[in-house]
Amino acid sequence: MRVVILGSGVFGVASAWYLSQAGHDVTVIDRQPGPAEETSAANAGQISPGYAAPWAAPGVPLKAIKWMFQRHAPLAIGLDGTSFQLKWMWQMLRNCDTRHYMENKGRMVRLAEYSRDCLKALRDTTGIQYEGRQGGTLQLFRTAKQYENATRDIAVLEDAGVPYQLLEAKRLAEVEPALAEVSHKLTGGLRLPNDETGDCQLFTTRLAAMADQAGVTFRFNTAVDALLHEGDRIAGVKCGMRIIKGDAYVMAFGSYSTAMLKGLVDIPVYPLKGYSLTIPIAQEDGAPVSTILDVTYTIAITRFDQRIRVGGMAEIVGFNKTLLQPRRETLEMVVRDLFPRGGHVEQATFWTGLRPMTPDGTPVVGRTAYKNLWLNTGHGTLGWTMACGSGQLISDLISGRTPAIPYDDLAVARYSPGFTPARPQHLHGAHN
């Protein structure tokens, strides 16, 4: 089957890899000169299924009001003048209750756990290197309340069969030795030993090279003008004067998927702006070993080989990609506070990207009302975590194979009134 994939970020490339391995003739189209040039370029670098959770959570509306008056707030809102943004925020607000939070988190953990298994299998099969580490991740608490609230997430982890360790402050240095110097600032942490880290751009670039060798065609520097349709099928992709045709099409344009699908499929995917710093290592014994997630500021600090990646924050401001100095100062403040000897912060590279986010936090992966159009977008801040599993899922569905995990509630149809999953829903996913 000829499959055309729109987008060469980690989702487009992962989809291309798995589809090519399934025997399909795959073409990838992207306006950029190479893979992973946008959202996949400099994300936080964590592969953390256990921390998979929607931003729409109990208490977030009140916190959002408080954050409006804080200098180092993890969330900021700026009206972009569109009714779509207002509708999206209203939908997000409706998901900020315990029932929706647990349901959405369950979906996210299921896909994320499966995705990590797929990544491991890919790594074992191909030997792909991407400065990855399998040292687990550590969520840090600065208040007693944060430590107590961890029990809510632990319930979901236990239901999903995810190993964890709840650590008091004095034990944090057992897994991250450099934290011994700042343990007095912390109340404890939640460690997930099975989580991983890695450079998403490096992974995507190398997987794209492997896919190219396997026969995948990459059409870079190619802007897509429109999807053409005839009846209930997509007829081609218009790129300037050229029309590229296939038997099946996969939309993996990230935040730009919504506009490209306008008039065809309505998806509630909105850009969530995030920032990162990439910092050269200064002192080895003062740097993190794996990934730290500071709950107070929702900022991740990740160790690559000789670099530290500091990423986080969320701005609901549309497609504005301006690099704001106050956001850089927040990232610098957190990494200096936790790892004062770790990196040469003054030499850091500052970056921003737009994560494609749904109001319920769960990505949109699966079929549409068009018989040959599939979606792989909306993964928000967990794109790297969910990439391989989503690519394998798309490949299975297009190939007519039964996926290894329940998938009906990941498709766009879940936003339709009266939607009921066709398969029993549970959290165990890849553990079945």
From Swiss-Prot:
Its cofactor is FAD. Disruption phenotype: Cells lacking this gene fail to use alanine as a carbon or nitrogen source and become sensitive to the presence of the amino acid in glucose-ammonium minimal medium. They exhibit a glutamate auxotrophy when ammonium is the sole source of nitrogen. GO terms for biological process: D-alanine catabolic process. FAD binds at residues 3-17. Its EC number is 1.4.99.-. Induction: By alanine; slightly repressed by glucose. Is activated by the Ntr system, mediated by the nitrogen assimilation control protein (NAC). The keyword Glycoprotein does not apply. Pathway: Amino-acid degradation; D-alanine degradation; NH(3) and pyruvate from D-alanine: step 1/1. It catalyses: a D-alpha-amino acid + A + H2O = a 2-oxocarboxylate + AH2 + NH4(+). InterPro entries: DadA (IPR023080), FAD-dep_OxRdtase (IPR006076), FAD/NAD-bd_sf (IPR036188). Keywords: FAD, Flavoprotein, Oxidoreductase. One of its GO terms (molecular function) is D-amino-acid dehydrogenase activity. GO terms for cellular component: cytoplasm; plasma membrane. PANTHER family: D-AMINO ACID DEHYDROGENASE, SARCOSINE DEHYDROGENASE-RELATED. Belongs to the DadA oxidoreductase family. This is D-amino acid dehydrogenase. It comes from Klebsiella aerogenes.
